[in-house]
Amino acid sequence: MASRIVTREEMLQRVARFKELTPSSRPLVDAVLPQFNRQIFSIIGGGVTEDASMKVPITAVDGFHLSIIKAGPKKGTGLHNHRTVEVFMPLTGTWSVQWGDDGENELTIGQWDVISVPTGIMRGFRNESAEEAYLLALVGGDDPGRVAWATNVMSAVREKGFDLDANGKIVEIGR
């Protein structure tokens, strides 16, 4: 069977140059909380981001979404769940991954290690390094759906004056 023909122009639409990416500083609603402050570079597909202004360079999604997370020391994400597998690989630094309804389970992964977090469980991650670090993240599926946040995370977010609208995007609600 002959392969299909893809032009250079078509292939260029599937290239993302890191130096040209603009990260979101509020990629998900939990980032309004200091301990979850981080940036996300969405590269292939929008993943589960809740930032309506996020620009994604590669919009052709073929079964997965790819992003890079940049976080300072002890920064990460709040406990959350979504309907797809999530895969993490530290590009730099050391990261912890938590899982369980209260994040009661935890393990640490280092540069180039990989963890595949299964569906149906709360999960979170944190940069355990003394310096800023990068984490590669893949979310499975063409449509990974929306994030389901732990109750305590959403309560803290609302106390800061933020919430999610009907489309799952971040909105300011005031205090």
Model-based region annotation:
Residues A2-E10, G124-R175:
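Double-stranded beta-helix
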Residues M1-G63, D165-R175:
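A short, N-terminal "cap"/entry segment at the start of jelly-roll beta-barrel domains
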Residues I68, G78, V87, V114, ...:
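Short, surface-exposed charged micro-motifs
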Residues K55-T59, T77-H82, W99, E106-T108, ...:
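Short histidine-centered beta-strand/loop micro-motifs
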Residues A71-G72, I109-S129, G140:
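Conserved metal-binding segment of the jelly-roll/cupin
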Residues V48-A52, H65-N81:
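Conserved short histidine dyad/triad with adjacent acidic residue
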